[in-house]
Each structure stands twice: as structure tokens, then as C-alpha cells.
């Protein structure tokens, strides 16, 4: 299960960035939202110079899996 509809449509880094920020808006408190938004921004900056298409797809896949895990974690707590 993907955290938000549209995960299967993410193909490019900018799409991933927007998708992950939308996921952050679904988290329960402002503090948690800000924490994960900061983490998304930092990751985007760290990987901004990546130019290998295979590696980019690997990063996108992993980021969506991580977002799924985080969303499920907070769903179970509520």
C-alpha cells in the first residue's frame, strides 16, 4: 500500500520531492511534519548532483518505500 495515491506515477526527482512533501502533510502533528519535511529537503540536496538514471530510480523506489513505512507507523499509533 502506498502512502498516497500516485506513488506509481513518480518517475523524476522533482515529482518525488512534491510527492514526499504531500505525504508529510498527512502526518499527525506539526512537529512530526516539520521533522520529515526537513529530512526530505536534506535528502533532496544531498542527492541533487546524482546523474545516473539507474541510481535515481533506485533512490525513488527506496524513498517511496520509506514513506510507506513512516505513514503506516503513524497510522498504527493513532
UniProtKB/Swiss-Prot annotation:
Superkingdom in the source lineage = Eukaryota
List the protein's name: LYR motif-containing protein 9
Cited Pfam families: Complex1_LYR
PANTHER family listed in its UniProt record: LYR MOTIF-CONTAINING PROTEIN 9
Family statement: Belongs to the complex I LYR family. LYRM9 subfamily.
Instruction: Name any GO cellular component annotation.
Output: mitochondrion
Whichever gene encodes this chain, its name is: LYRM9
Amino acid at each position: 500500500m502506498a502512502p498516497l495515491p500516485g506513488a506509481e506515477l513518480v518517475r523524476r526527482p522533482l515529482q518525488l520531492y512534491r510527492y514526499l512533501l504531500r505525504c508529510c502533510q498527512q502526518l499527525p502533528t506539526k512537529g512530526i511534519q516539520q521533522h520529515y519535511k526537513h529530512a526530505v529537503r536534506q535528502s533532496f540536496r544531498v542527492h541533487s548532483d546524482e546523474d545516473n538514471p539507474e541510481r535515481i530510480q533506485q533512490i525513488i523506489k527506496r524513498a517511496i518505500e520509506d514513506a510507506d513505512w513512516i505513514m503506516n507507523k503513524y497510522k498504527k499509533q493513532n
